[in-house]
Amino acid sequence: MDFNASLRRAIKTGDVILGQNNTEKCIKEGKAQMVVIAANCPENFRSQLGSYENLFIHTFEGSSVALGKACGKPFMVSTLAIVSPGESDILSLKRTA
């Protein structure tokens, strides 16, 4: 699976929430099926994520700049939540983890 292509497809055809505050709200509402964080995501947010049981977290190997580019955005993205994958196979990462 090409992660970047799957992520772009999820953004195009599904429901993906970008940004730390919006992701946190989405998690608290129980809508997030998966959370993706950049390698340089702030440590305090990472530790907050650890308190949520049954939340699948995927660490993107690049920086927030690289994650933004992978999303097709011209800005940094430190974290995002997959609410609905649409036509993407991105949730298959949960099965391989």
Curated annotation (Swiss-Prot):
Cross-referenced SUPFAM superfamilies: L30e-like
GO cellular component: cytosolic large ribosomal subunit
Gene3D superfamilies assigned to the protein according to its UniProt record, in alphabetical order: 3.30.1330.30
Key words of the record: Ribonucleoprotein, Ribosomal protein
GO MF term list: RNA binding; structural constituent of ribosome
Cross-referenced Pfam families: Ribosomal_L7Ae
Family matches, as InterPro entries: Ribosomal_eL30, Ribosomal_eL30-like, Ribosomal_eL30-like_sf, Ribosomal_eL8/eL30/eS12/Gad45
GO BP annotation list: translation
Family: Belongs to the eukaryotic ribosomal protein eL30 family.
The protein, known as: Large ribosomal subunit protein eL30
Organism the protein comes from: Methanoregula boonei (strain DSM 21154 / JCM 14090 / 6A8)
